[in-house]
């Protein structure tokens, strides 16, 4: 067998390996409950993107310019963040490096959670909670005003498979993936993990504020 023929199996194996291994530059995020996303974010707003452009954001260690996408936004409401309105949001230029793509033109409203930058602007990635406003449930919209904040001292633990358990009283077990094979299930859409008067945490469902009896250890 010639050298060229012997090299074919090796080339095929290398090609197959390249297709099976995850790309190093892919964006990978762990699922989080909307309440966790709210609590982890510096800024949470309802807004529209009206324009976008590519901008330079300094240089890397080799002197090459760092490109980012700048979205000019119209803020509708701030649920968490600084006193002044957010005017610009920045993100990476491609989804492979966790860049976010927003519809521009000011017609589509979003809930946008992200990190604050020192200049009063905001930075977002695909790992942040960014969804069209009209896809949120009524409970999620109401929870943004106060409910989620009530549970920021609680820990929401995602259950990837049965069995799964909580390890402390301040945890709520997030079961959507097990029960519905969907991280945007009933617990994500209709429940918040609320801290009660004894320091424990429990799931609470409903658009109305939690009753005092619930906070004083009523079974949810």
Swiss-Prot record:
Site (Involved in metalloproteinase-binding): residue numbering on this chain: 64, 96, 158, 177
SMART domains: NTR
Domain of life: Eukaryota
UniProt-annotated stretches for the region Involved in metalloproteinase-binding: 27-30
GO CC annotation terms, alphabetical: extracellular matrix; extracellular space
Cysteine pairings via disulfide bonds: 27-98, 29-127, 39-152, 154-201, 159-164, 172-193
SUPFAM superfamilies: TIMP-like
Subunit structure: Interacts (via the C-terminal) with MMP2 (via the C-terminal PEX domain); the interaction inhibits the MMP2 activity.
Protein name: Metalloproteinase inhibitor 2
């Amino acid at each position: 067998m010639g050298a060229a023929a012997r090299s074919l199996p090796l080339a095929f194996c290398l090609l197959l390996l390249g297709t099976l291994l995850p790309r190093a530059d892919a964006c990978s995020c762990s699922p989080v409950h909307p309440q966790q996303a709210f609590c982890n974010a510096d800024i949470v707003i309802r807004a529209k993107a009206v324009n976008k452009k590519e901008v330079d954001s300094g240089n890397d260690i080799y002197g090459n310019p760092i490109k980012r996408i700048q979205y000019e936004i119209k803020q509708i409401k701030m649920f968490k963040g600084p006193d002044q309105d957010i005017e610009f949001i920045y993100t990476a230029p491609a989804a492979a490096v966790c860049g976010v793509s927003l519809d521009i033109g000011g017609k589509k409203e979003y809930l946008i959670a992200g990190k604050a930058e020192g200049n009063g602007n905001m930075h977002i990635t695909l790992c942040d909670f960014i969804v069209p406003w009209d896809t949120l449930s009524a409970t999620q919209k109401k929870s943004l005003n106060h409910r989620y904040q009530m549970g920021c001292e609680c820990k929401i633990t995602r259950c990837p498979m049965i069995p799964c358990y909580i390890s402390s009283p301040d945890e709520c077990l997030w079961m959507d993936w097990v029960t519905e094979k969907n991280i945007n299930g009933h617990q994500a859409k209709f429940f918040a993990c609320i801290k009660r008067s004894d320091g424990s945490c429990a799931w609470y469902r409903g658009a109305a504020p939690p009753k005092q009896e619930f906070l004083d250890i009523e079974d949810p």
